[in-house]
Amino acid sequence: MRWLLFAMSVAWLGCGGEDPSQITYDEWAERAATVQCSHEARCEGSSLDEAACMAQVLERYRQVEPELEDATGARTGCVRCMRIRTEVLTASLDSECQQPVATSRIDAACGADQQACAGAP
């Protein structure tokens, strides 16, 4: 009986949450900007207001979106980059900035010069 309860709880947990492939480019940009600006303010000591930071980052993602749409698979690559960046920075924030940012993971997904998102942060 315990095994059945365990299996049901695991299945229930597996069914929850969002499917990352169903989240739009704009939603990923919003998430990435939120986490990036929070991380900069809390972990890096940025003096830039989080709202101003958000506006700048979102504007940059909006500027590159048409360029990404023109190249086959580019938009998907940028969304993957935003997802990985969000995961990495969230892990750092969750540890109260004690966990170092896995820049190698971000670079692997985004490129060292942020090529995956056409230079957007």
Where are the model-predicted features located?
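Signals and flexible motifs at protein termini associated with secretion
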Residues: 1-121
